[in-house]
Structures are given as C-alpha cells and as structure tokens.
Amino acid sequence: MTNNSERKRLEKRIAQLCKFIGRSPWVFHVNSGSCNGCDIEIIAALTPRYDAERFGVKLVGSPRHADILLVTGPVTNQSLERVKLVYEQTPDPKIVIAIGACPTGGSVFYESPFTNAPLDRIIPVDVFVPGCPPRPEAILHGVVLALEKLAKMIKGEVPPEEGEENE
C-alpha cells in the first residue's frame, strides 16, 4: 500500500468516526522530555499533506478542553508530576496516546534513574504508537484507534466498521 492510499484511507476513517461521535476530537500534546523527533511528526500530521485538522482533529492549549492526550518523551523526573496533573485535568471520557519509542517502552532511557518510562506505569494508556520517531501515517492510525475507543465511551456502542455507513 502506498503512503498516499494509506493516508487517504486513514483520513476517510477519521471523518467517519468524527461523524459517528458527532464532534471533532480535540487533542492536547504533552512533551515529557522528548528529543522533539516525535513532536515534529505530530506537527507533520497536521500540515496540509496529511491535514488532520480538516476533520477537526485540533491541538488545544489546555488539557481541560481535550478529548485525547498525546504524550511524547520518556517522562523525566522533572515532568512526572506535570504528566499526572495534565491527565487529571483532562475531562472524561479521555483517551491517552503514547507517541514514540520513549513513552511506549522507554527506548534508550529504559530503567534510567532520571526517567519513568514506560508511560503506562504512570497513567493509563489507551493507544501505543511505537517508532523513533513514528511516521505521520502511524500517528494518524493511532488517532483512528483512539477515536474508535472514544466512540465506544461516548456512544456506548461500537462504531461502524470501515466502509460501513453511519445511520
């Protein structure tokens, strides 16, 4: 599958899920000590080539407005309490996506005395997007998985499968 066809499939699925839940997902990004590689790929997913904002997937400035938390980095000792606070400030229902090798498994920082990775030791994680850094297509796939979980939480029912129409 080419990147272009994969991207179009993901875009279509995001639009379908947003229509099903009746709103657009708002996302808050938490950098917990990353090298910024994953952060750059998140921004790439929002640029015109991928254009997740076209479907309403929008970065917000406060966790109090977010449906989805994107967390990058190995969760340094300095960022540990902030990550917990941001999680608590995000209203329910919420979804947490760990973006990159650092929050998903620790990467080169695993068992370092200065980090607390993996992220699921600290807060519940719903979707893991591995990679160092993950491609924008992988991030969009993670958003699709997050939206499917969010749809189940909001609507109390399973969203239609890819290709099926909403009623």
Swiss-Prot record:
The keyword Transmembrane does not apply. One of its GO terms (biological process) is proton motive force-driven ATP synthesis. Keywords: 4Fe-4S, Cell membrane, Iron, Iron-sulfur, Membrane, Metal-binding, Oxidoreductase. [4Fe-4S] cluster binds at residues 35, 38, 102, 132. It comes from Pyrococcus furiosus (strain ATCC 43587 / DSM 3638 / JCM 8422 / Vc1). Probable subunit of a hydrogen-evolving hydrogenase that utilizes protons both as a substrate for hydrogen production and proton translocation. Acts by coupling the redox reaction via ferredoxin and iron-sulfur (Fe-S) clusters to proton translocation across the membrane, thereby conserving the redox energy in a proton gradient. Its main location: membrane. Inhibited by 0.1 mM Cu(2+). This is Probable membrane-bound hydrogenase subunit mbhJ. NCBIfam families: PRK06411.1. The membrane-bound hydrogenase complex is composed of MbhK and MbhL, but may also contain MbhJ. Its cofactor is [4Fe-4S] cluster. It is an enzyme of class 1 (oxidoreductase). GO terms for cellular component: ferredoxin hydrogenase complex; plasma membrane. Belongs to the complex I 20 kDa subunit family. Optimum pH is 7.0. Active between pH 6.0-8.5. GO terms for molecular function: 4 iron, 4 sulfur cluster binding; ferredoxin hydrogenase activity; metal ion binding. Signal peptide: none annotated. It holds the Pfam family Oxidored_q6. It is found in: Cell membrane. InterPro entries: Complex_I_20kDa-like (IPR052375), NADH_UbQ_OxRdtase-like_20kDa (IPR006137). Binds 1 [4Fe-4S] cluster. Optimum temperature is 90 degrees Celsius for membrane-bound enzyme but 80 degrees Celsius for the purified enzyme. Membrane-bound enzyme has a half-life of 2h at 100 degrees Celsius whereas the half-life of the purified enzyme is 30 minutes at 100 degrees Celsius. It catalyses: H2 + 2 oxidized [2Fe-2S]-[ferredoxin] = 2 reduced [2Fe-2S]-[ferredoxin] + 2 H(+). The gene is mbhJ.
